[in-house]
């Protein structure tokens, strides 16, 4: 049959060998023709062999035409009643389940302006801007596609978090945003939900193959991009919504092939996306949503010029910027990208999450290893899965090995010297519970939704108090209580004053050595010369 002849060429996406198009003869027809998957490689959802291809209909990894046929047969059996109902789309009446318009956006019917202000105050939501939309109380009241609401429920989103209550309606009303919120408050879903709703609406009205992207999300690290894309896939399941991950460490040709075959969302790092745009002709004319996740980190890593270069290639998109902390550089970036943006702040982003109990211990550098061994062998104090932050890449490898030898625990390390596949596999093993401890540099300190983590250990203090806030925040997601154990000593003296203020605000105990240090009391922070002159 003609359909069967074109089956592999039209509906399998694969990593090309010497070009951007897959030769029909190279497609594996049968499962046994495919090799076994190596560590870190995608696996076929049917047989577990190397997932060389992507099934366009489901976005799942598959190894051959045979497994694709099995996958689609299962999908057809599971969704047959839904498929029958969906035939109504062909009638003259439009499918309004995807329609989202500013003028029919539902308000909270039973609340007047005073009650809205009271609600924002109770939820610690602060807004600044003109005609700010009212917050929503549930996902179903925001005009989202029914399938998206079901996906949210299946993913465990029972009701919106405070940041989602305010960001989702503001985004749906096509407003540009600058958002700051506590670590672990649900920022990622707050921008993915309106993106998926928008893309679904556009594609349902103009459904053709191989269309260019409608939205771009930029993030500072490969791990964060990977997680954002994975969450987008979960929330967009069953909707006309496909993604492309554009990060270093993965083959560029595969990323290009994916985009050329039609996607709605690009998630990537600025450097890799610039590289892709310079070497290949990617149509960005229809991109109307531009998201910057962890803006402060993007700026700290020197991505400002690259972000601006990508932005200038777009045609007046809606801009949404998210960060756990907002400083003058972030505000300057906001003013450059979006005029009249709504400023939304939830909680106190400059302080650790209130749900995290901070336990600061004075430990000399030579005693740190022994102290962490004691913690991890104590049933009372060790609450796996746990994340341990260190200051160096080699330190991450050495400490992970030492913990394994001393305690018998399964430990992995993650840092920038690891390949993308190694980092992805280590993170997968940690998130699935195969290992109970991950030792890492600051690469997991930003934005990652480590949902099961309830304990963080700062083996080495970070270089700034902002990074301290981010790393401590890994111990709590979505308001669930967690614990952060922090090792400090004289080497961290530049952070003593700010650290003490944070601990006082949180009502956390302060070690005697820290409280009595001359760097905490009486001597202002500054350069060595200023302290010398003061002491004289």
Swiss-Prot record:
One of its GO terms (molecular function) is RNA helicase activity. SMART domains: DEXDc, HELICc. Residues 168-344 form the Helicase ATP-binding domain. CDD domains: SF2_C_DEAD (cd18787), zf-HIT_DDX59 (cd23022). Keywords: ATP-binding, Helicase, Hydrolase, Metal-binding, Nucleotide-binding, RNA-binding, Zinc, Zinc-finger. A motif (Q motif) lies at residues 137-165. Residues 1-25 are annotated as: Disordered. Residues 355-518 form the Helicase C-terminal domain. It comes from the Eukaryota. The keyword NAD does not apply. ATP binds at residues 181-188. SUPFAM superfamilies: P-loop containing nucleoside triphosphate hydrolases. A motif (DEAD box) lies at residues 293-296. Coiled coil: none annotated. Residues 1-10 have a biased composition (Basic and acidic residues). InterPro entries: DEAD/DEAH_box_helicase_dom, Helicase_ATP-bd, Helicase_C-like, P-loop_NTPase, RNA_helicase_DEAD_Q_motif, Znf_HIT. Its EC number is 3.6.4.13. This is DEAD-box ATP-dependent RNA helicase 41. It comes from Oryza sativa subsp. japonica.
């Amino acid at each position: 049959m003609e359909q069967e002849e074109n089956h592999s060429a039209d509906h399998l996406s694969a990593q090309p060998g010497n070009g951007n198009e897959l030769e029909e003869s190279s497609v594996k027809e049968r499962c046994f023709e495919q090799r076994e998957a190596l560590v870190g490689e995608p696996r076929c959802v049917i047989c577990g062999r190397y997932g060389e291809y992507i099934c366009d209909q489901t976005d799942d990894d598959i190894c051959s035409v045979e497994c694709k046929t099995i996958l689609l047969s299962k999908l057809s059996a599971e969704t047959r009643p839904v498929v029958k109902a969906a035939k109504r789309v062909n009638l003259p009446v439009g499918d309004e389940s995807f329609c989202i318009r500013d003028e029919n956006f539902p308000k909270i019917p039973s609340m007047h302006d005073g009650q809205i202000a009271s609600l924002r105050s109770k939820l610690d939501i602060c807004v600044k801007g003109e005609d700010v939309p009212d917050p929503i109380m549930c996902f179903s009241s925001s005009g989202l596609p029914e399938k998206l609401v079901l996906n949210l429920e299946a993913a465990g989103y029972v009701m919106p978090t405070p940041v989602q209550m305010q960001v989702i309606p503001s985004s749906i009303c096509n407003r540009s945003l600058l958002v700051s919120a506590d670590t672990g408050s649900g920022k990622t879903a707050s921008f993915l939900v309106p993106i998926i709703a928008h893309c679904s609406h556009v594609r349902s009205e103009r459904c053709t193959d191989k269309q260019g992207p409608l939205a771009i999300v930029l993030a500072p690290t490969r791990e964060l991009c990977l997680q954002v894309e994975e969450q987008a896939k979960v929330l967009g399941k069953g909707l006309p919504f496909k993604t492309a991950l554009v990060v270093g460490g993965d083959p560029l040709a595969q990323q290009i092939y994916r985009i050329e075959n039609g996607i709605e969302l690009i998630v990537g790092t600025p450097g890799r996306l610039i590289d892709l745009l310079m070497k290949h002709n990617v149509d960005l004319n229809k991109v109307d949503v531009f998201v910057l996740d962890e803006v402060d980190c993007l700026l700290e890593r020197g991505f400002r010029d690259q972000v601006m270069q990508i932005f200038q290639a777009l045609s007046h998109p809606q801009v949404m910027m998210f960060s756990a902390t907002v400083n003058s550089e972030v505000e300057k970036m906001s003013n450059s990208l979006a005029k009249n943006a709504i400023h939304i702040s939830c909680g106190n982003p400059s302080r650790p999450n209130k749900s995290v109990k901070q336990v600061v211990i004075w430990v000399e550098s030579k005693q740190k290893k022994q102290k962490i061994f004691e913690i991890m062998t104590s049933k009372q104090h060790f609450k796996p899965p746990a994340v341990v932050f260190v200051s160096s890449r080699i330190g991450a490898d050495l400490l992970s090995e030492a913990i394994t030898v001393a305690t018998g625990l399964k430990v992995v390390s993650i840092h920038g010297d690891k390949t993308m596949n190694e980092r992805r596999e280590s993170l997968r093993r940690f998130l699935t519970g195969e290992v109970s401890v991950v030792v890492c540099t600051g690469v997991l300190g930003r934005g990652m939704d480590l949902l099961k983590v309830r304990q963080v250990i700062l083996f080495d203090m970070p270089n700034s108090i902002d990074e301290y806030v981010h790393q401590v925040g890994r111990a709590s997601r979505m308001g669930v209580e967690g614990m952060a154990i922090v090792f400090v000593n004289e080497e961290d003296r530049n952070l003593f004053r700010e650290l003490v203020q944070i601990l006082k605000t949180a009502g956390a105990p302060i070690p005697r050595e820290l409280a009595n240090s001359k760097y905490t009391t009486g001597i202002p922070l500054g350069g060595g010369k200023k302290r010398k002159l003061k002491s004289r």
